[in-house]
Amino acid sequence: MKKTLSFIALFGLAFVFAQTAANLTEFKENIAKQKVEAKKALKPFRYDGSKVTYFNFKTYKQVKEVEIYLFNNTDYRFSFNGKSLPNDVTIKIYDKDKTVSDRILLKEVSGVKGQNLVVESSDLNKVYQSKKSGSSRLKRVFVDYEIPGVPGSQNKKPTMKERGAVILVMGYKN
């Protein structure tokens, strides 16, 4: 009897582990496909790089920040893919990082879930120059992903349904 129960418990654990591994593999495969899709949205700009930001939805609000350098007065295009999001997030783009109190909000986008969005640095520069007179072009921008709290989330052991990612692909004008 003990051997039978041990076998059933071991089999059940193996099944749960295999299911989780399969879900994670599927999640990463979807991200790879969505990265290709985001890369296509860069045209006619040339691909420069990408950054996938992974996170788990929790019961409290979170902010993840990514810094992007802008070189040599070059125009850039940023493609954000939010098709790996089970819940919506807000993207805010600033001129300085989140530790600086007088930073300028250059662009805010909500409704990212299920979308592929494009933002150009030329538009960000126009906003920056209009809000800060006498300034030159931006040398870098900070992308903040505001992740809302989701009631009922598992903070300690999140499920695959609470896992999300935003794919950011960057390109420059040639």
What do the PLM-derived regions correspond to, one by one?
Residues M1-L24:
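Bacterial Sec-dependent N-terminal signal peptides
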Residues T20-K64, Y172-N174:
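Non-catalytic extracellular/lumenal accessory regions of secreted precursors
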